[in-house]
């Protein structure tokens, strides 16, 4: 009788231990899945933003016409248009947060591309995760002399956390101090 109680207690302990181990492994798997999904969304956003700007730039250059691109960061979409005609709408990943440095905190931005395929003012788009920590930066540079739009992509290094609340000040500081910028970012 005593032997049966020991086996029953041992079985209950084994079941509880198995459940705890399974729960722990599921928790790790869930965290890794979220990290994978975030990385996938960031790569998708970076690719869509870069391709949209290149498309408008090359179309403008080939057709020798002014093209427009609307960046709606609150709706998380890019609208490409030719004069008043809407050509294409690109949806950005919804789980990410976007910030641009073109003007002060406007969520809707309308950019005009010249006949040479350039933008009038250089600026950057920062991509943040759900926790409002910056993960990526896409910078746009227009050069009238060379007649092309240059786009640089930067991945955030893991050394310094930059949040959505301090990105404006951070951007101004690192534009003046490029050495500090390259401590935090890796060009791709």
Predicted regions and their residues:
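N-terminal single-pass transmembrane signal-anchor helix
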Residues: 1-33
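Broad hydrophobic/π-residue packing in well-ordered secondary structure
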Residues: 8-12, 33-36, 57, 76-78, ...
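An N-terminal domain-start capping segment
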Residues: 24-29, 33, 37-40, 149, ...
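N-terminal helix-rich module
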Residues: 28, 58, 62, 66, ...
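Membrane-proximal N-terminal amphipathic helix
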Residues: 35-66
